[in-house]
Amino acid sequence: MPARTERPGAGAGSSAPCWLSPEEVGETAAWIASLQLRDGMVPWYRGGHADPWNHVEAAMALACAGRWAEVGRAFDWLAAKQHEDGSWCTGYVLGGVVEPRRDPNACAYVATGLWWCTGLGGGRSLLEEFWPMVERALHWCLLQQRPGGEIVWSVDPDGVRGTFALLAATSSFQLSLRCAAEAATELRQGPSPWLEAAERATAAVARGCRAVDRLFAGQRGSDGASSEGRASDGRASDGRASDGRASGGRASDGAWPGSDPREWAAVFAPKDRWAMDWYYPVLTGALAGEEARRRVADRWQEFIEPGLGVRCVSDRYWVTAAETAEFAMAAWRAGFATEAAELLDWTRHLRHPSGAYWTGCAHPECVRFPGGQLSTYSAAAVVIADHVLSRRSPAAGVFSGPGEVAAASEEA
């Protein structure tokens, strides 16, 4: 394992041990289940709210432990809350809505969750029961995909779309579409339009990553953003706003960006400081091969806190369990197996005796932040990462690379 002041080297080996024992996986899943409300909703933390993406993530972790009753209740909750147009609100509490906007990426993630659970043992019956719900969600999501392939970050209740896209969200979106294509094939339906839309989203992510790298490589300041290419208000140096609008008024959702890398860099909101923008293109397979390895290596020093985990934000000494677990999967997918194994092991210091996980801690004092919070999405991310790196089932292929995803249902 290279020192964290260095870039990672090639990982050794193609398999890995199980970092969590079956008993530990069971403890963590039991803790997540203990927070599930009577209507099936899984909140972020006890007394907190829920959103569709993290709710699905919790269901995926419950499936890892074979808690199918709770998995079924989680999907039942989604079916009950789905709007007629196929979308969900962004924030829920028991009996109500706290954030009425829609997040297309979160709405699409039900496809990833259902395909994951199918491969873990939910089988064809689970897939058939909830596939209509997934289809409705994705039909709505495709309406939010812009001509360049990226997906808008939000839609207001009255249908007004957000003016910019997020790199991490579009990366996750294309993975969900690919999972939907695999599910459709399993059900002997055609994979289109899901696969075609996924290809467009993947191309948008790749172009966005390359454009930012070309424009701002070597120019990032201590905050992880370009010190020259973007002003403090998030505008590119040519006057292009971070919502993708050119200074002349041409919106990026009205036409496909041209070959100028400045246009593609402006398509996505500038979130360079956030770890998710760094690793999600790799985690979800939007970038692969040498390009993925290079992306992982290039910003390793900015985000890795030696022996502790991954910083949520590059210029803040806050290490989080979810980002560390997710990045471990991204590093694994990029071929850094040894480094990925060690990264996942670092989440141990955030594990609670109950099997829960602290959301994160601020260093150097190691203060639990925020507010000593134990979060279901953090626990779920660690369980899922353990499942992927240890290849406990064919479902691991969802996050470990093409060719394995299609096998996810064969042993169900």
Regions found by a protein language model. Give the residues of each.
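Low-complexity, Ser/Thr/Pro/Gly-enriched N-terminal "stalk/linker" regions
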Residues: 1-53, 64-88, 141-149, 206, ...
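Well-ordered alpha-helical scaffold segments within catalytic/enzyme domains
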Residues: 2-18, 56-70, 109-126, 172-189, ...
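Long, intrinsically disordered low-complexity tandem-repeat segments
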Residues: 222-252
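Acidic/His metal-coordination segments adjacent to aromatic residues that form catalytic metal sites
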Residues: 88-100, 152-165, 304-306, 362-368
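Extended ligand-binding clefts on enzyme/binding-domain cores
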Residues: 19-20, 51, 129-155, 162-175, ...
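CBM-like carbohydrate-recognition segments
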Residues: 287, 313-323, 329-412
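Aromatic-rich carbohydrate-recognition surfaces in CAZymes
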Residues: 51-55, 59-146, 167-170, 344, ...
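Hydrophobic core segments within long, regular secondary-structure runs in both alpha-
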Residues: 22-33, 59, 68-79, 108-118, ...
